[in-house]
Regions:
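N-terminal secretory signal peptides that target proteins for export/translocation
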Residues: 1-6
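Bacterial N-terminal signal peptides
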Residues: 9-23
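Catalytic loop of the DD-peptidase/beta-lactamase superfamily, centered on the K-T-G motif
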Residues: 25-63, 151, 194-207, 211, ...
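Active-site helix/loop module of the DD-peptidase/beta-lactamase fold
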Residues: 33, 49, 71, 79, ...
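A short, polar/charged loop-to-alpha-helix boundary motif
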Residues: 69-78, 368-376
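Short glycine/proline-rich turn/loop motifs
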Residues: 73-77, 165-172, 245-252
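Catalytic nucleophile serine of serine hydrolases
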Residues: 87-89, 180-183
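Mid-domain, small-residue-enriched loop/turn segments at the edges of structured enzyme/sensor domains
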Residues: 131, 184-185
């Protein structure tokens, strides 16, 4: 959902790792220095708090919290502390579909329009042919993150309207020809679940999955975390310093990323997945047939060579299944997914033939932290030679940060600072309309241009002249970290023909799909 993205001065607090574990005796199955390794990871990557779950052979080896829920506070993370697991929710949505298939209410390869007659994609052929399976495997022809601006940042569109507006989004590739990660089609899957079950996605997943698995502390709404007592605060690096950020609370895309969970509950979820749907009482949430569907690659990835530091992670195959990704590692099949929201990133990893599951939930946007911990645990159980994953991922992060900084500096040096806008500022003001998003307004206020997305309050920004007829939208909510170029194209008579946008920084989250907008002057009449 979000990108898998300063020194924290509270090192003493970080190093005094304290956790409430479910099974202290079972924890000896992990390396003896594991807690120290976690503490070192957290210090290196400035993570205030995280939770880890490890299951093996049907038993909980570890379900434990480390660090603090909020930077500067004393409340500790424990095994029940809730984290936004973001796109790790997608496996729950795919499992819900699998349950309904087993009940005969859905078919994996039936067209979506059989269940949602109102549903449309841009291409009528795709509308007719898009199946339930296609909703879950990122091969619809939509571009990366296409349509995410309909819900991110929090918008006034409800889930059905987000799905309805897909009909206006042009495809980036031909149908089923390429992988491009999306979120909006998982929301459509949520609409399908409601149509055939008579329950909202939230009610179905809560009663038919969380309740039966025993995930009693978990919730299915982004908005629910705010009212929970034992909940982690999201953090992110802002202007070089890690600090708390506002949680994402909109519920219009819950089927793609709305679940909040802690280590204890995620441990239960992993055990059910590893045991082909078998619950603690011996009953089946789903059957092995659904497991085979969930874990079979549908959309293959092109496999290349990783950076030299990650030579050990070279894979022979990789692809996307149903709510899970698959690859191999040292001869073992790995089933996994990651998740990202503002201030939260997580990773869930299963090794079916080892009956091993690992989950790392963090309250800081450090993909490097969960990677370093996950691969350390995998190496331990798979008998792999030791690798200093902390140093490895620290070097990769430093290199990536350096490349991004160089690209941002280059954009500044390329700017023609002697140029001026072609028109007086008031001539740029007006209402502009994109076919799938709707209206964006630009107004002259106090001698400066201000841009506002009509359905997204957080996308309000001051336009700063960059060069020629290009401005930069500096969003007033600086937590977005997504400033965007705004370029006006003029007609021969000097009037504005269209407006295009693009992210300024290459590190901008892909869900800010500004590049997909084509804004044209809106005709007189009601706004859209």
């Amino acid at each position: 959902m979000r990108r898998l993205h300063a020194t924290w001065t509270a090192a003493g607090t970080l190093l005094s790792v304290m956790a409430a574990g479910l099974s202290a005796q079972a924890a000896i199955s992990l390396p003896r220095d594991f807690d120290a390794y976690v503490a070192r990871t957290m210090k290196q990557f400035e993570v205030p708090g995280l939770a880890i779950a490890v299951v093996k052979d049907g038993k909980v080896v570890l379900a434990k919290g480390y660090g603090v829920r909020r930077l500067g506070d004393s409340a500790r993370v424990d095994e029940r502390t809730l984290f936004g697991i973001a796109s790790n929710t997608k496996a729950f949505t795919a499992t819900a579909i699998g349950i309904l298939v087993e009940e005969g209410k859905l078919q994996w390869d039936a067209p979506v329009v059989n269940y949602l007659p109102w549903f449309q994609m841009y291409d009528p052929f795709v509308t007719r042919e898009l199946t339930i399976r296609d909703l879950l495997v990122h091969r619809s022809g939509l571009g990366l993150g296409a349509g995410d601006l309909l819900w991110w940042p929090s918008s006034t569109y409800d889930r059905k309207e987000v799905a309805r507006r897909l009909r206006y989004i042009k495809p980036a590739t031909s149908f089923r020809s390429a992988y491009a990660y999306d979120n909006v089609l998982y929301s459509v899957a949520g609409e399908v679940i409601e149509a055939v079950s008579g329950q909202t996605w939230e009610d179905f997943v809560s009663s038919r999955i969380l309740g039966k698995v025993g995930m009693t502390a978990s919730s299915v709404r982004h908005s629910a975390a705010a009212g929970a007592g034992d909940v982690a605060t999201p953090h992110a690096p802002i202007d070089g310093h890690v600090r708390p950020v506002a949680p994402f609370t909109s519920d219009n895309v819950n089927p793609a990323g709305g679940i909040n969970a802690g280590a204890a509950d995620i441990a239960k979820w992993m055990m059910v997945q590893l045991d082909s749907g078998r619950l603690g009482d011996g009953s089946q949430l789903f059957t092995p047939r659904t497991t085979r569907e969930l874990w079979s690659v549908v959309t293959p990835f092109r496999v290349g060579n990783p950076p030299p530091e990650l030579a050990a992670l070279r894979t022979n195959f990789a692809g996307y299944a149903l709510g899970f990704g698959l690859r191999d590692y040292r001869g073992w099949k790995i089933v996994s997914h990651t998740g990202g929201l503002p201030g939260f990133v997580s990773r869930l990893t299963l090794v079916p033939d080892q009956r091993l599951g690992i989950a790392v939930l963090t309250n800081q946007e450090s993909v490097e932290a969960f990677e370093a911990i996950t691969w350390r645990v995998l190496d331990h159980y798979l008998g792999a030679p030791p690798t200093d994953w902390i140093s490895t991922f620290a070097r990769l992060k430093a290199r990536g940060d350096s490349i991004t900084a160089a690209q941002e500096r280059a954009a500044v040096t390329r700017r023609d600072s002697t140029s001026h806008p072609s028109l007086p500022l008031e001539r740029y003001a007006g209402t502009y309309r994109d076919a799938w998003y709707g209206d964006v307004t630009i107004a002259l206020e106090g001698g400066k241009l201000v841009l506002r997305f009509a359905h997204t309050p957080d996308l309000t920004g001051d336009l700063e002249h960059y060069q020629y007829d290009t401005f930069i939208a500096r969003w007033r909510n600086r937590e977005l970290r997504a400033d965007a170029y705004v370029t006006f194209a003029l007609k021969p008579d000097g009037s504005i023909d269209q407006v295009k946008m693009a992210a300024v920084s290459p590190a901008t989250d892909f869900s800010f799909d500004f590049q997909d907008l084509l804004l044209v002057p809106a005709p007189a009449g009601p706004s859209r």
